[in-house]
Amino acid sequence: MTTILTDLSSSLSCHAASKDSPTLPESSATDLGYYSTHGGTHSPHDYYQNQPYSQPISHYPYHQFNLNGLGGPGTYSPKSEYPYGGGYRQYGHYREPAMAVQEPVTVKEEPEPEVRMVNGKPKKIRKPRTIYSSYQLAALQRRFQKAQYLALPERAELAAQLGLTQTQVKIWFQNRRSKFKKLYKNGEVPGMEHSPDNSDSMACNSPASPTVWDNNTPSRVQHTQAQPLPHNSSPSYLEDYNPWYHHPQNLSGPHLQPPGTMHHTPPGTGAVY
């Protein structure tokens, strides 16, 4: 009896100890032989070398190795997982003809040489002259009478109104100023007979000099006295020609006197009534 009790107690103690401290089962000789044979004969390099990653089945080599064990290699295609892959591949096909079309355009846009050989001598090529319409010339001449120099905003506004470029307006004003200076030096400043509507692009319509106004002052003064202008139009007329109209009145001369003093002079002592 004592031997049976001791055997039962020893078996129970061994069973309780095994539950408290679980340990891995000891590897047998066959297990060691299994892992040693596979681990010794196959290296990681040999494993990856035997895989068919060099075959053109998929564009992504890591798709052929299923790490989760759900399927064999090559089960996922790049189009299902990356739908934009085809679009990027097709972009190269669209890009090649576009570049081929742009090549002749860049050749045509090259500027022509400014100097050409004519009879063995270099000759500079000039751009064609700009032909202004009568409306454009009239507007430019009216603006030149007001101011011979334009600021950048004024030049841009005038060019937009006339349908010209700012460079064309600037060159026109430069030519007009040079022509005016040349005529002024020669004493050939034209009068008001050159109206702004004149189509001659080289005519200078600057404000007239006081000497031109001296000849026309009596007729103009008599006309204003006989037929007075309306009240609304006379101030604007005098404001436009204020520096040119009032300046000759300060000069002395019988032709600058008012019509009343010029035609009704006081009689002398020996005058006959």
UniProtKB/Swiss-Prot annotation:
GO terms for biological process: epithelial cell differentiation. Residues 20-30, 198-235 have a biased composition (Polar residues). Residues 125-184 bind DNA. Keywords: Developmental protein, DNA-binding, Homeobox, Nucleus. One of its GO terms (cellular component) is nucleus. Residues 258-273 have a biased composition (Low complexity). InterPro entries: Distal-less_Homeobox_TF, Distal-less_N, HD, HD_metazoa, Homeobox_CS, Homeodomain-like_sf, HTH_motif. SMART domains: HOX. Gene3D superfamilies: Homeodomain-like. It is found in: Nucleus. Expressed in regeneration blastemas. Detected in forelimbs, hindlimbs, the tail, flank, and brain as well as in limb and tail blastemas. Its main location: nucleus. PROSITE patterns: HOMEOBOX_1, HOMEOBOX_2. Residues 15-37, 188-235, 248-273 are annotated as: Disordered. Belongs to the distal-less homeobox family. This is Homeobox protein DLX-3. It comes from Notophthalmus viridescens.
